[in-house]
């Protein structure tokens, strides 16, 4: 998904999977239900890839005591074409896998870093203050 292949990433989800964004900024859905909805949303988000150049990504995967659940920390960095500055973005994913498919993915992304990356800090501030 970090590499801009959201539609392909969606194929890893079960037909009735749920993708959540608990810290979703204004204008972004907090929950997507079903592989098709996930594919449609991630496909639409691929246009945002034109706003930045990713130079690298790192991930750390942590096992849990639940054999169906892994926790992953994904950080990518590069250049924001919107701000003309380097960026660093980290998200934490709590992923439940059953029968080889993702059934639930809770994506705890940093909405402030995302707003900076996309040049939308003003929109985020206005949404938070009601301005």
Q: For the regions a protein language model found, what residue spans apply to each?
A:
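Short, aromatic-enriched amphipathic alpha-helices that serve as compact interaction elements
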Residues: 1-5
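A solvent-exposed, acidic/Ser-Thr-rich amphipathic alpha-helical stretch
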Residues: 7, 12-68
């Amino acid at each position: 998904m970090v590499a801009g292949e959201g539609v392909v990433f969606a194929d890893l989800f079960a037909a009735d999977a749920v993708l959540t964004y608990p810290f979703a900024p204004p204008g972004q859905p907090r929950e997507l239900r079903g592989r098709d909805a996930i594919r449609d949303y991630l496909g639409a988000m691929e246009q945002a890839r034109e706003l930045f150049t990713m130079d690298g990504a790192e991930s750390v995967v942590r096992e849990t005591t639940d054999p169906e659940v892994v926790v992953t920390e994904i950080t990518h960095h590069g250049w924001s074409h919107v701000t003309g500055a380097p960026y660093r973005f980290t998200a934490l994913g709590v992923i439940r896998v059953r029968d080889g498919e993702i059934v639930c993915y809770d994506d705890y992304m940093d909405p402030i870093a995302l707003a900076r990356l996309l040049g939308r800090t003003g929109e985020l501030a206005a949404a938070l203050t009601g301005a």
